[in-house]
A protein has these predicted regions:
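Structural detector for internal amphipathic alpha-helices that build alpha-solenoid repeat scaffolds
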Residues: 1-17, 26-30, 34-49, 58, ...
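Buried hydrophobic core positions in alpha-solenoid tandem helical repeats
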Residues: 23-25, 55-60, 88-90, 121, ...
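Alpha-helical junction/boundary sensor with strong preference for TPR arrays
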Residues: 31, 63, 96, 132-139
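Short, conserved active-site loop motifs that form the nucleotide-linked donor/cofactor pocket
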Residues: 85
């Protein structure tokens, strides 16, 4: 099947596990079908390694077109390359107030606290906490996660 053949199928009718990494990368980085993109990225993430990293980096380097995909790409990148995720989140932080995207960043910090305790990661958490505080709490999907993050990283 070609990429176009796959894109006309409902997202839940595609057998992502049977597709090779190159096709999954194409599906993950296309910008017309968000459910397909997210599902393809999920399969790459489940496989781990450089293919998941490459797709997440490509999604995050492109003009954002789906906030859920961007958020998922952030958590995927954090899972496979936390150092690169810190740099990428730092770049994205100044341009977003989207609680979905900020929530993904919060999830990364809480999932990998060792990477955010010192150096660039710690400096990032300070800026992220300041940004999170500017967004109404009820805008976040996970209020407990937001509260836990602010309790731990909010500047005093």
């Amino acid at each position: 099947m070609t990429l176009n053949d796959l894109l006309v199928l409902p997202h839940d009718q595609i057998d992502y596990a049977s597709l090779d990494a190159a096709v999954l990368h194409e599906l993950a980085t296309q910008n017309s079908e968000p459910y397909i993109a997210t599902s393809a990225l999920a399969e790459l993430g489940a496989r781990g390694g450089p293919d998941a990293r490459a797709a997440a980096v490509a999604i995050l380097a492109a003009v954002p077109w789906d906030r859920h995909l961007v958020a998922f790409a952030i958590t995927t990148l954090c899972d496979v390359d936390c150092g690169s995720a810190i740099e990428t989140m730092e770049r994205l932080l100044g341009g977003t107030h989207d609680p979905k995207v900020l929530g993904a960043m919060v999830e990364c910090v809480l999932s990998y606290p060792d990477h955010f305790g010192t150096g660039p990661g710690h400096a990032f958490t300070d800026r992220l906490a300041a940004k999170v505080e500017t967004v109404e709490p009820d805008q976040f999907t996970d209020l407990d996660e937001r509260a836990a993050f602010l309790a731990r990283y909010r500047s005093t």
